Each structure stands twice: as structure tokens, then as C-alpha cells.
UniProtKB/Swiss-Prot annotation:
GO cellular component, one term: glutamatergic synapse
Subunit structure comment from the entry: The L-type calcium channel is composed of five subunits: alpha-1, alpha-2/delta, beta and gamma. Interacts with the PDZ domains of DLG4/PSD-95 and DLG1/SAP97. May interact with GOPC. Acts as an auxiliary subunit for AMPA-selective glutamate receptors (AMPARs). Found in a complex with GRIA1, GRIA2, GRIA3, GRIA4, CNIH2, CNIH3, CACNG3, CACNG4, CACNG5, CACNG7 and CACNG8. Interacts with GRIA1 and GRIA2. Interacts with MPP2.
Family according to the record: Belongs to the PMP-22/EMP/MP20 family. CACNG subfamily.
Locations listed in the record: Membrane; Synapse, Synaptosome
Organism: Homo sapiens (Human)
Annotated disorder: Intellectual developmental disorder, autosomal dominant 10: A disorder characterized by significantly below average general intellectual functioning associated with impairments in adaptive behavior and manifested during the developmental period.
Function of the protein: Regulates the trafficking and gating properties of AMPA-selective glutamate receptors (AMPARs). Promotes their targeting to the cell membrane and synapses and modulates their gating properties by slowing their rates of activation, deactivation and desensitization. Does not show subunit-specific AMPA receptor regulation and regulates all AMPAR subunits. Thought to stabilize the calcium channel in an inactivated (closed) state.
Keyword annotations: Calcium, Calcium channel, Calcium transport, Disease variant, Glycoprotein, Intellectual disability, Ion channel, Ion transport, Membrane, Phosphoprotein, Synapse, Synaptosome, Transmembrane, Transmembrane helix, Transport, Voltage-gated channel
Protein name (Swiss-Prot/TrEMBL): Voltage-dependent calcium channel gamma-2 subunit
């Protein structure tokens, strides 16, 4: 089995779709996108005062919350406040827009939904193999999911790098976690699966066109082998050839022969027919003279050579039969 075999392509597409969906779902649902140093705040109520204790520790964060990795608040998680009160940004700047998009996490969630739809299309293509547009829809879903994923990653990086609540030293002391790399890997796999699905659709379309052409050729060859079709075709070809050459058909008929019209006048002059027997007896041309038969036949044989063969039987009977 080669790499471009249909079974191998379908297996790779199915495995890739499951992997991309699983990786993106894990990335969205976990809190290990970013490792950085932050402040874990807590409030403790005593008898007469409320004290706030701020402690800067190592934290890990995701799309939804931040958790402490060390200190007295190890394992404590809190929701991410994307719009703190002490932040020095204006509401009409691009920073506010990035924070709004970052807070909604719309692009990662949209990527998960599109990956799920693409997986359903791939599963449906196995049950409805005659509907080739399903695999094309799967490819479109996966490509769109990859684009939505990479947009969400770019927005996350931009929002984290431009966080005004962090000092310059804190902005440089962070690293991305395995959830972030799961999302990036999901983007790569989703794009590969989308391209492979579109390639499968193109291959199937080419096979269908080749099969249709072969079927049309076989039907045409089968029709030409039918005897009635061949007979009609021969008649049409003959009629067309006759219509293009009318002069040859007229010349070939015996009526058009030049010597054929001269023969009756010659024979009638040999035997003069008369209704009066007396005139027939006195007229020298009405009697048949056997002495001059040989000389007359010699003159009569001077008929054109090209007409002698076709009229031989008729002239022989008329020469030997007296009237």
C-alpha cells in the first residue's frame, strides 16, 4: 500500500482529526498555557481589622484562571481579571480590544467547534461514500479551525506581552506551558488534515470523471457494433456519395449510351414495312436479298466497339430473323 492509497489517506485523516480535536480540547480546558511570577492575594479577617497579604510566587495560568505553584497559597486558583481597576490603559485603545478578545476566548472555542464538525463530516463520509461533498466539507472545517486556532494564539501572545499590570522585568520572566504547545500542535494537525481531505476529494472527482469517460466510450463502441446501426450508416454514406456525384450515375445507365439510339434506325432501314402487299412486291427495298447479306453484315459490324458487347444478344436475334 502506497502513501497515496485511499485507505491510508482515510486512516490518516481520521487519526489526525481525532488528535487535533483532543489536543485543542485539552488546551482550552487546562491552565498550563503560561508560567510566570505573580502575586497571590488573600484576605484574612481578624477581630478588628482586615489584613491583606500579597505574596509574589510562581504561577501557571490558562484561558480562564491562574493558579499558584508555591508559597502559602500553593494550589490556590482564581479567575483571571482581564480588566483590573489599577490598570493604566484607556477604554478606547487597542489594548482594551485585545483584553476583551482574550477574556472571551472566542477563537479557541470556535476552533474546538469547527474541529468537532470536521470530525463528524469525516465519520459521515464513511457511511455515505457516494456523497463526495462531505469530505470536502470536512476539509473546509479543518482549515477554518486551524485559522481560528492560530488567531487565538496570536491574540493570547499579544495580550500577555502587553499586560500593563506587569513590570518590564516580570514581562520578560515567563514561559509557555504544555497547554500552549498542545494548541499550536493542534493547529498544525488541523491544517494537515484539511489539506489531506481536500486532496482526497480531488482524487475522487478525477476518478469519477475518468470512469464517466470510459463508460461513454464503451457505450459508443457498443452502438457501432450493432448490425442495424452499421447498415444505416452504410446507407447514409452511399446516399451521400450518390448525391455528390450525379453525373456519373447518369452516364452509367444504358439509356445514356450514344450508340444505343442509333441502332433502331439502322435495323428499321434494313426491313421496310409496308401495309400494301403490291407495293411491297414491286419495291426493291422491301425484299430481303441473301446475296448481299455478307456485305451488309460487314457494314453493320462497324458499330462502335464500346457498345457491341452490351447489345450483342439483341442485334443477333434481329439480324437472323426476317420480317
Amino acid at each position: 500500500m502506497g502513501l497515496f492509497d485511499r485507505g491510508v489517506q482515510m486512516l490518516l485523516t481520521t487519526v489526525g482529526a481525532f488528535a487535533a480535536f483532543s489536543l485543542m480540547t485539552i488546551a482550552v480546558g487546562t491552565d498550563y498555557w503560561l508560567y510566570s511570577r505573580g502575586v497571590c492575594k488573600t484576605k484574612s479577617v481578624s477581630e478588628n481589622e482586615t489584613s491583606k497579604k500579597n505574596e509574589e510566587v510562581m504561577t501557571h495560568s490558562g484561558l480562564w484562571r491562574t493558579c499558584c505553584l508555591e508559597g502559602n497559597f500553593k494550589g490556590l486558583c482564581k479567575q483571571i481579571d482581564h480588566f483590573p481597576e489599577d490598570a493604566d490603559y484607556e477604554a478606547d485603545t487597542a489594548e482594551y480590544f485585545l483584553r476583551a478578545v482574550r477574556a472571551s476566548s472566542i477563537f479557541p472555542i470556535l476552533s474546538v467547534i469547527l474541529l468537532f464538525m470536521g470530525g463528524l463530516c469525516i465519520a459521515a463520509s464513511e457511511f455515505y461514500k457516494t456523497r463526495h461533498n462531505i469530505i470536502l466539507s470536512a476539509g473546509i472545517f479543518f482549515v477554518s479551525a486551524g485559522l481560528s486556532n492560530i488567531i487565538g494564539i496570536i491574540v493570547y501572545i499579544s495580550a500577555n506581552a502587553g499586560d500593563p499590570s506587569k513590570s518590564d522585568s516580570k514581562k520578560n520572566s515567563y514561559s509557555y506551558g504544555w497547554s500552549f504547545y498542545f494548541g499550536a500542535l493542534s493547529f498544525i494537525i488541523a491544517e494537515m488534515v484539511g489539506v489531506l481531505a481536500v486532496h482526497m476529494f480531488i482524487d475522487r472527482h478525477k476518478q469519477l470523471r475518468a470512469t464517466a469517460r470510459a463508460t461513454d466510450y464503451l457505450q459508443a463502441s457498443a452502438i457501432t457494433r450493432i448490425p442495424s446501426y452499421r447498415y444505416r450508416y452504410q446507407r447514409r454514406s452511399r446516399s451521400s456519395s450518390r448525391s455528390t456525384e450525379p453525373s456519373h450515375s447518369r452516364d452509367a445507365s444504358p439509356v445514356g449510351i450514344k450508340g444505343f439510339n442509333t441502332l433502331p434506325s439502322t435495323e428499321i432501314s434494313m426491313y421496310t414495312l409496308s401495309r400494301d402487299p403490291l407495293k411491297a412486291a414491286t419495291t426493291p427495298t422491301a425484299t430481303y436479298n441473301s446475296d448481299r447479306d455478307n456485305s451488309f453484315l460487314q457494314v453493320h459490324n462497324c458499330i462502335q466497339k464500346e457498345n457491341k458487347d452490351s447489345l450483342h444478344s439483341n442485334t443477333a436475334n434481329r439480324r437472323t430473323t426476317p420480317v
